[in-house]
Amino acid sequence: MDTSAVSYLSSIVLNNNYKEWNNEKIIKWLSDTKKIQKVIVFKIYEITGRDLEFLSDKILFKMGVGIRDLLSFKSEFEILKNNYDNNNNNNNNNNNNNNNNNNNNNNNNNNNNNNNNNNNNNNNNNNNNKNNNNSNSNSTNINNNCSNNNSNNNHINFNSNSNITNIKNNDSKIKNKKEENKVPIIDLNQYEYVESISLGVFSVVGKYKRKGQENEFIAIKKIDILSLNEEKIIKEINKLYSINHPNIIKIIGYCKDQKNYYIASKYYPKGSIKKNTKQSPYSEMNAKRISVKILSGIDYLHSLNPPIIHRDIKCDNILLDENDDPILIDFGLSYKTIDDSTNLKTLCKKPFWASPDVNNQEIQIFSEKTDIYSFGCTIFEMIVGWESYSKKENNQPNLQKLPDNLTISCRLALGDIIGLEQNFKPDSKDLQKLSWFNESLPPIFQSQELTKSTTNTTTTTTTTTTPPPPPSPSSSSPSMNENKKIVTSDCLINSFKESGCLIFLNGELMYDNPFDKDCYQYNIVIPFGTPHLREVIHKDKNKSKHLDKIELFIDDHLAKGLVIKLGNFKLDLSKEFKKTPTFIDSIIEYLLDLLQKDNDDDDDDDVPESIILNIAVGFYKYISNFITYQYVLNQPSHFC
């Protein structure tokens, strides 16, 4: 390891000052020592701060770092970190020994002082007893308070804390009485039962109609008092009543009798998403619209103090209102215990979408991560459809079952939420930053032409059915930047229809794919939920034997300059793939599957030309279809 780099990294680790990591210096060292070939990924991703210490395999793989490079870099840093930790532990042990000696001396001195103080306090208390009993009690309390600094007055402290505890208990009882009256009381006699909506472990939800009113309905959940802690039920009712979010069910009142609690809420006649997805799966656009609003509700719940954990998010617990907006329901009220300090809940029944870590627990403990995992599974359930997974095993979704035409941003989001890596699950705020939850999904084919979307053009021309092409990207015309701003999916689709998708390497035409709607929407199922893609591939002997050839082919093409052209619009893939290394992984996975289907048993040392040809054809075909599809649909402005 380079001496200057060792000194530099050591100073960072020693001071825990990771924010000062000089990205350029690290990259230079990595490049000079050839520790990582694709060092540019560090610069692209702006790896700074605590990332130096917490560069997990998942992060590095997503950045496009190969397995060999990953192990090399991590081993260098681990050696440095371990050396620092060992030295630091030795120093801590020495300091602890010194502190223990000092503490022993201080304790001996304090004990002597405490004995003297106690004697003085007792004398004062005796004198006060002769004068006035009431004054005696007060002075004793004063003496006790003054003596709290002594280490031998635990008995006095215990009595004092007991008094405080009693006061707090009394206050909490008063608060509970106030909270019990906070939720409006409904008169159940004004409603008549219509039908059952759902049946739970400890509760039944029914549809009720207001007497004398034809179209006034409410939903009432009946909870058996004997099956749960009544105090907890009251607490949960008040907590749920205080929730105020447009996509979370709102309690409108409650009542109780000797056997049951009755909790009333608005009735939603459209039913749950599960009911709707039984007919057919949701489109990605519709699933996204619902998911964004549910995520907003989850973030609201998790941001409360203490946070509220739903613990059973699924399509069956999401209703649709009159505008088809989602309403998250059923916060349970069926928990065995609720830890007031952490609000973590344990449950007597297993949730529908249980994360692997929850499945492995004898006593199931739920946290915010539980909700995030089940939320991702709910998105999966909407897109795939209920019937496709009504007979699934272990309630674990299979990302390879996703529809072929999903956008790359959707696959990445689902991979992060329900992928194999359980230790790096994003929270609700992390999810809201992902592109899929932020960007709008434009229709693949829109009816309007380019002339309808470019209102800033000032040229006066006769009406034409086909819009004029923009100036060449190499032109120095002042209007070039204006044209770049108005690049839309419509522009690219029109150009694609006219001239097809052309792929150039070093300016030479390598592949010409004419426009075809079915071919254009061609897509591949990509297991983006597998963070250790290269590692998994290496374990598969049938696939790994071609991995080096594919990587060499791709690196060679990107180094020479790979460009997609749709008419006069072009996209420099050599630059784009550095920003989105996940595309490289998807290409590699596709090519490996393609070669495996050919059942090629030739040795690595004797590579037939047919393998290279298959790699080239598959490479260009994948780019001209799937990659082009993703950029035209999601990032048209990247074309120039």
Swiss-Prot record:
Composition bias, Low complexity: 453-465
SMART domains in the record: S_TKc (SM00220)
Domain Protein kinase per the UniProt entry, residue ranges: 191-437
SUPFAM superfamilies assigned: Protein kinase-like (PK-like), SAM/Pointed domain
Coiled coil (UniProt feature): 73-100
Enzyme Commission code(s) on record: 2.7.11.1
InterPro entries: Kinase-like_dom_sf, PAK3-like, Prot_kinase_dom, SAM/pointed_sf, Ser/Thr_kinase_AS
Pfam families noted in UniProt: Pkinase
Broad EC category: transferase
Residue ranges occupied by any SAM domain in the UniProt entry: 21-84
Keywords from the UniProt entry: ATP-binding, Coiled coil, Kinase, Nucleotide-binding, Serine/threonine-protein kinase, Transferase
Binding site for ATP: 197-205, 221
Catalytic reaction annotation: L-seryl-[protein] + ATP = O-phospho-L-seryl-[protein] + ADP + H(+); L-threonyl-[protein] + ATP = O-phospho-L-threonyl-[protein] + ADP + H(+)
Active site: 312
Domain of life, source organism: Eukaryota
GO molecular function ontology, one term from the record: ATP binding
Region (Disordered): 84-165, 448-482
Family annotation (PANTHER family): SERINE/THREONINE-PROTEIN KINASE SAMKA-RELATED-RELATED, SERINE_THREONINE-PROTEIN KINASE SAMKA-RELATED
Similarity field: Belongs to the protein kinase superfamily. Ser/Thr protein kinase family.
Name the record gives this protein: Probable serine/threonine-protein kinase samkA
